[in-house]
C-alpha cells in the first residue's frame, strides 16, 4: 500500500466523520462502494446497503436521537488487507446534544472500517463500531 493510498483512506475517515455530522446524503452516500453488499454493525443494529445505512441508521437512529453530533476519530491506523482492500481502525468519541432533552451526551468506542479500491478511489464497504 502506498502512502497516497493511506492518505486517501485517512481523508475518507475524515469525510465519514463530517458526513455523520451533516447527515446529508450528498456527503454520506458517495463515500460508499458501488456494486457491493455494504454493511454497518453498531450497538443500534445491523444495516445492509448504502440506502438502508443512510436512511435507517444515520437519519432514523442518529438523527432522531441527536440534535447535533460530532464524531471524533482518534489514532486512526490504516492496515492493508490486499492490493484493493484495507482496514481503518480507530478509537472514536462523540460529542452530541440529545434531541429529547437538549442535554450534552457522548459515547466512546472502537471502530473498524473496510475500504475497497474502485476505479482508483478508496470507498467504504463495511463499518463496525462498538461502544466502550
Identify the role of each PLM range:
Residues 78-87, 102, 115-123:
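A short, structured loop/turn motif at beta-sheet edges
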